[in-house]
Swiss-Prot record:
Residues 651-799 form the Helicase C-terminal domain. GO terms for cellular component: catalytic step 2 spliceosome; chromatin; extracellular exosome; nucleolus; nucleoplasm; nucleus; U4/U6 x U5 tri-snRNP complex; U5 snRNP. A motif (Q motif) lies at residues 391-419. Residues 43-65 have a biased composition (Basic residues). The modification Phosphoserine is found at S14, S16, S107, S109. One of its GO terms (biological process) is RNA splicing, via transesterification reactions. Its EC number is 3.6.4.13. A motif (DEAD box) lies at residues 549-552. It comes from Homo sapiens (Human). This is Probable ATP-dependent RNA helicase DDX23. Disulfide bonds: none annotated. The lineage of its organism: Eukaryota, Metazoa, Chordata, Craniata, Vertebrata. One of its GO terms (molecular function) is RNA helicase activity. In vitro phosphorylated by CLK1 and U1 snRNP-associated protein kinase. Phosphorylated by SRPK2 and this phosphorylation is required for its association with the tri-snRNP (U4/U6-U5 tri-small nuclear ribonucleoproteins) and subsequent spliceosomal B complex formation. May be phosphorylated by SRPK2 on Ser residues in the SR domain; the phosphorylation is required for the removal of inappropriate R-loops during transcription.
Amino acid sequence: MAGELADKKDRDASPSKEERKRSRTPDRERDRDRDRKSSPSKDRKRHRSRDRRRGGSRSRSRSRSKSAERERRHKERERDKERDRNKKDRDRDKDGHRRDKDRKRSSLSPGRGKDFKSRKDRDSKKDEEDEHGDKKPKAQPLSLEELLAKKKAEEEAEAKPKFLSKAEREAEALKRRQQEVEERQRMLEEERKKRKQFQDLGRKMLEDPQERERRERRERMERETNGNEDEEGRQKIREEKDKSKELHAIKERYLGGIKKRRRTRHLNDRKFVFEWDASEDTSIDYNPLYKERHQVQLLGRGFIAGIDLKQQKREQSRFYGDLMEKRRTLEEKEQEEARLRKLRKKEAKQRWDDRHWSQKKLDEMTDRDWRIFREDYSITTKGGKIPNPIRSWKDSSLPPHILEVIDKCGYKEPTPIQRQAIPIGLQNRDIIGVAETGSGKTAAFLIPLLVWITTLPKIDRIEESDQGPYAIILAPTRELAQQIEEETIKFGKPLGIRTVAVIGGISREDQGFRLRMGCEIVIATPGRLIDVLENRYLVLSRCTYVVLDEADRMIDMGFEPDVQKILEHMPVSNQKPDTDEAEDPEKMLANFESGKHKYRQTVMFTATMPPAVERLARSYLRRPAVVYIGSAGKPHERVEQKVFLMSESEKRKKLLAILEQGFDPPIIIFVNQKKGCDVLAKSLEKMGYNACTLHGGKGQEQREFALSNLKAGAKDILVATDVAGRGIDIQDVSMVVNYDMAKNIEDYIHRIGRTGRAGKSGVAITFLTKEDSAVFYELKQAILESPVSSCPPELANHPDAQHKPGTILTKKRREETIFA
């Protein structure tokens, strides 16, 4: 009874054969059949073990009826075994699915199928070995003593020098080289593949979805027509297409191709834009006979078929004219004659008004004529209520005795600065004149001064001579002061006006004696004038006219404190009011003619307007009228500028080559240092050239002697420093050589301004070195602005000539380099 119960429980606990058969899926059955075919020995072993387990369980179940404890343990054991069996079945199912996948992959790639087959063969061999019991003995691990002995032997072998023959060394080097080449090729190939993958990926991402779908469909159709090709074949086709596209793009880029212009049509365009080009028009005749019509060449007044078209038109117009004349009444004829008369009168008046300003009288000039006049002479003014310029000396309001002196001095026509500055000066207004060197500035401030001094009674001038001069003219250099003195004496001596020059290099006692004798005009340099004022040789009690000539040069030379000190010695009582009254011409003219109670008039002439000059003008000038003449601060349009880049040692050889070209004297050569000036002049004299020097180290007599020799023609070449760069007027200078480039562009402009004066042309040659790179940019701009000069490519393309010194260049985003 107990045995039957145990059998029943065993049947309940263990699944029946039918259930196990039912639970087996067709896949499992198929896998088992395959395994059975591939390894029959494994299948036999599995059946034996299963029968053994079943037989053992039956015998144990019969002997277990004695004890419930043993039954319980048996059930648990059977349950564990069943669980293990189910787990094995599940693993087998998974292996079956995996094998199916491997089979599918092997159909696509033959390499994988081979791997799977070899693995399967290895498994079957292993099973056979297990079955026959031919197991290889396992390798035993080495002992510690063996390891140490082996390591010691290797170290001794490495320590011993090994001799290699030449052939072995060559073979080893060749092998290493081959390995390096292979490694490099492998890396390049990997890099190429990565780049290609990246490009393909980017192309696919940028590709239009519709275009991508179209391309995939086309590739699919090609694969269907060509058979099932592998991935490598498709990749090869794709690479060939990419290469053909790349070749087409290269041909289009370098061999030229017809670029299809994109047709755009705006919404507001009425004209329809067709898709074809004008060159595709098929209506054009290809036959040149019809394409180009024959034109009959006629001689003289010949006409085709005896018909003259012009004659026909004339006869037709005459016919209609006669017809209209017959139909008009007498009143209509008179009305037409009156209309024509009025039209002729209007045209005559228009022609009269449109005359050039030179053909008109002064009272006929209109505002438009004055504008044209200023444009003709490049006169630009700034400031309120500025008077009109003078057209000629006769049209000016100057006294007859002044005009007579002007005529005797040889001034036929006024220069542009004189045309505008003299009328402003006669109104007692402050003036800032910005004009190039050699423009006649001296007469522009002298003539209004002489006009005012001659209006004063001569007795008062003699009695009040101890109160100082009426006017002070300040110049930056002795040479310029002496030149102004010559011009002033030329104008003032016929009028009885005395002039004294207070400059360095001459005895101060002699100058003091001349000042005590009395004078109306003092021409001075700032340093010596302060010395004379502090030693009480001179007072400025009645000084009402101050002229600052070459004001920018004075500021550059450091005379700004001296100029301010001189202006502080002036009386304060005669200063102009800083109101609109200073711009009123009637009040200023009345004050100008009042005699002793005249307001102080300050005149400043400069070639450039740096900030320091503007600051000085704001401090001491009251509502000034600013006059700009031409391109002030720029080189003459008549001076041809030439530039040569060279080293310091090549300068002398180049200078001799230039002098041998036969330029007419006088010639001025500028250097930067006094010592270099003397050395260059001596070397030129040794080579047979007549040269003289002029610099700050020379005494006054030596300077005057050098200038007089050059003007008289006794010397041909003047070697000078920047002392001669400004204000010195030497007639007919044919060439200026900048042996040493000036330190700034303003000094360069004044240097080359010594030539090309009085309407004549000149040549300015400059030697440049690497040390002059600070002025390359401004020099390049000055040469480019000149119509008669050409900039050499060495200077135009030089890196320092591309931007102004001190400017911070910002790179464009496309020029930036990002270091990752």
